[in-house]
Amino acid sequence: MDRKQKQAEKARPYGLLKPAALGKIPGRFQLHQEALPHLPVPPLQQTLDRYLLALQPIISEEELNHTQELVAEFRKPGGVGERLQKGLERRAKKTDNWLSDWWLKTAYLEYRLPVVVHSSPGVVLPKQDFQDRQGQLRFAAKLIEGILDFKTMIDNETLPVEYMGGKPLCMNQYYQILSSCRIPGPKRDSIVNYAKGKKQSRHITVVHNFQFFELDVYNSDGSPLTTDQLFIQLEKIWNTSLQTNKEPVGILTTNHRNSWAKAYNNLLKDKTNKESVRTIEKSICTICLDAPMPRVSDDIYKSPVAAQMLHGGGSRWNSGNRWFDKTLQFIIAEDGSCGLVYEHAPAEGPPIVALLDHIVEYTKKPELVRSPMIPLPMPKKLRFNITPEIKSDIEKAKQNLNIMVEDLDVIVLVFHQFGKNYPKSEKISPDAFIQLALQLAYYRMYGHSCATYESASLRMFRLGRTDTIRSTSIESHKFVQSMDSPDKSDQEKADLLRRATQAHKEYTNMAIQGNAIDRHLLGLKLQAIEDLVSIPELFMDTAYAVAMHFNLSTSQVPAKTDCVMCFGPVVPDGYGICYNPMGEHINFAISAFNSCADTNAARMAHYLEKALLDMRSLLQSAPKSKL
């Protein structure tokens, strides 16, 4: 029997089940996944044409001429390009997704910089109204209950399938975010997942004052603990971890991946340490009970909280109160600030935010269940034996982390003048409008356009992750050049603005249908490496390096909750910009490195705000054109 037939045999018994909202629906996830289309390999000539178009606004004419020669060589009939393309097409036939394994390895597991700042995004939640330990623990208990409620939907396979433009999306990432952890390796990391099977996780990790605890979250009959029960258990944890002089073992996870891999092997030589680390790795998720940060005024409150979510503030604050390899860590501080940080390898932002939206809604519900009064066992404290060698590893990690913390400049801008409803009223895609404002802000600051990355979801395809929307286009470049030019009328500028937003929308649609260029080019390059042939000159060209040097790395992560995701820049002289467009306002998080003299997050925020307002006034002053 071939693979397809086998799958069909497996799928048949469940084919009659009606998807119900409640109860277990075993096999539903599998069935849904198998019905999804495979990621296509785009036509070679199409990608090469689009690559040249993408280069036009960001490189000189001279460089472009040189690249055109390389492209002409690469695309010759029977040439290198065609050979690699055939290899990719063969790979696509043999696998569920020709890209996903390669992408996981190259983008995440083989990436050697620390996950902190360089890879793991944070999310800032609205400030909660508690100011003390009691409120902190009560909120944490409710939050855990919300996580377990979501976990039940995942376990029972009753999670509602998401759709985009009427097409069902791959739901696989939801099954990867709980009970999973990244493990450091000397050249490449790996991911472990304990969500399924007999050894399914029944506990979470709680960290307080750098001390880790194993907290069982299910009763012996399999029912999840209630908020009251969880609150009692969290109080026990709090009261048995009051010492503030403990070695912050968790800080080891903030180091460069190769250094951490060495320290990890070192740490695990001891049996007690190994058991403690395995318990953390197997847990459903981590809850970090943080000490309050220094007080700041309300108007800038969100910016230090964003930093807090991304890195914990450094070794004297809460960075030791984490295990950064854990996929999901929820952070709740005594002063009401809260959010999460997640390890990026298993999932993108949207599934994380969907989980978050669910939890936030859940925490608002009144408590109905009376808790059973059975006394619960004391949560187990995870012990670590710290040898002088481990102590020295911790000290080195602290120093490196503190340098990173000092270097990261992050600002949360809440743009209050309008939200996504305004561009919609002008029949413009809100995302295209915001991206064009970023282009305008950057152009006004630096006098030229730069390579811009916006993530596009490939979840219409089985195991799809992301591709790149290149927001810098010939059309966007024309618009930003014209915006402050006295030679153009408002009408002409408004027409260029509409053309640029239309071009962005078209590129977005192309990308989500698997027709963007970035992953295809990466695939051709990796195919060459796999075939052990020399890397084609096209990929050794300066233009390729410029195209891949994303001074603007951006992502729209919409949420029902009034939150904002944040991440660090992907190049030393760049910006990391994430935004959540709400109806009447837009939340932005903007990051840059202090070590780069040319970038400044506050300056970018200022120019971005001005760009958004100027684009609105332009549209209001020019009547709608006949485009």
Curated annotation (Swiss-Prot):
Its EC number is 2.3.1.137, 2.3.1.7. Keywords: Acetylation, Acyltransferase, Endoplasmic reticulum, Fatty acid metabolism, Lipid metabolism, Membrane, Mitochondrion, Mitochondrion inner membrane, Peroxisome, Transferase, Transport. SUPFAM superfamilies: CoA-dependent acyltransferases. It comes from the Eukaryota. (R)-carnitine binds at residues 453, 455, 466. The active site is at 344 (proton acceptor). Residues 1-30 form a propeptide. Gene3D superfamilies: Chloramphenicol acetyltransferase-like domain, Choline/Carnitine o-acyltransferase, domain 2. The modification N6-acetyllysine is found at residues 262, 269. This is Carnitine O-acetyltransferase. The gene is CRAT.
